[in-house]
């Protein structure tokens, strides 16, 4: 795969449609192209198909963890930055996410300035 660029869309991964839609709408208002995935397996499939400038992934989803998305990006040797987002965060989870390769760890609700 090619290197990611700002011309590539942002991938939003969240099992909750309301949150996914809100993040998509907010990012689109910022002038970004956005694609969404409903979980870990959907995200992996999309990552196989194209490059993304950024991946924003929920930490806890029914089919797995946002850390699995980070690990999959690492396995593909992509340089795509990943931010892990969660409503149930703690310091240990943040450290684990950052050690796995995420560039940021955000707690819901996230603000426009955080995006």
Residue ranges, per PLM feature:
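Acidic catalytic/metal-coordinating carboxylates
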Residues: 39, 65-68
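Charged docking surfaces used in two-component/phosphorelay signaling
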Residues: 21-29
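Active-site residues of response regulator receiver
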Residues: 14, 58, 86
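Short amphipathic alpha-helix used as the core "switch/output" element in two-component signaling
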Residues: 45, 67-79, 96
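Active-site beta3 strand of CheY-like receiver
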Residues: 51-56
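The feature encodes the CheY-like receiver
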Residues: 20, 62, 90
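Short hydrophobic/Thr-rich beta-strand motif most characteristic of the beta2 strand and flanking loop
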Residues: 31-40, 46
């Amino acid at each position: 795969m090619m290197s990611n660029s700002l011309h590539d869309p942002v991938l939003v991964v969240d099992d909750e449609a309301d949150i996914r839609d809100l993040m998509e709408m907010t990012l689109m208002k910022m002038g970004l192209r956005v694609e969404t995935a409903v979980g870990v397996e959907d995200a992996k499939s999309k990552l196989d198909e194209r490059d993304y400038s950024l991946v924003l992934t929920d930490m806890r989803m029914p089919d797995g963890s946002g850390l699995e998305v980070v690990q999959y990006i690492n396995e593909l040797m992509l340089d795509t930055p990943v931010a892990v987002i969660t409503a149930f965060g703690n310091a240990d989870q943040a450290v684990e996410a950052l050690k796995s390769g995420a560039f940021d760890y955000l707690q819901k609700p996230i603000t426009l300035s955080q995006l």
